[in-house]
Amino acid sequence: MIDFDPSYNFSQDRTFAFISEHPLIKEAGAEVGNPLIEGRLVQITENILAARGFTRVSKPEEADLAVGFTLGEREKIQVDSYPEFYRGGYGGWGWGGGYHGGYGGQSVDVRQYTEGVLSVDIYDPQERRPVWHGRATGRITKKMQENPEQVLEQVLGNIFATFPPSN
């Protein structure tokens, strides 16, 4: 999901900084098990913005834009139910054959999984107001946890796909 202030003119912006030395904010109650995530978010974001002509400066008050991140995860439960049918029919051996009735039932599958949420917020540091928001939500798998840098590159690439917006 992408949202931005249509009254803000992004075409004039050339520099960015991160909102603080530690720009990653964790959602309340969320645990970020890997302390390297913040550095990867910063480096990948810097690479993406540099490829689009932005230059990083050290202090947010000297930048055109200030970037921050919010990261969270939640345990979710998915419940799916499916109808089950046992069909009746004719059959039997010898003298006792005949019709057997069927019945309906339901099968329920319950799965627990972890959902991750990464938000990128960009502010106008002079006016101290948000001007752009990007968010990605998805199921976190064991395979993703094995290669977090590749996953973050893909997720941030998708979030920044239309940044800066043309208004």
Question: What is the predicted function of each stretch?
Answer:
Residues 35-40, 85-92, 139-142, 152-155:
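Short, low-complexity, polar/charged sequence segments that are solvent-exposed and flexible
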Residues 2-24:
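Post-signal peptide N-terminal segment of mature Sec-exported envelope proteins
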Residues 1-7, 107-167:
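C-terminal/domain-edge helix-coil "capping" segments
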Residues 19-76:
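N-terminal segment of the mature soluble domain
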Residues 10-14, 56-63, 122-129:
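A short, structured loop/turn motif at beta-sheet edges
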Residues 25-26, 41-45, 91-95, 144-148, ...:
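Glycine-rich loops and low-complexity Gly/Arg-rich segments
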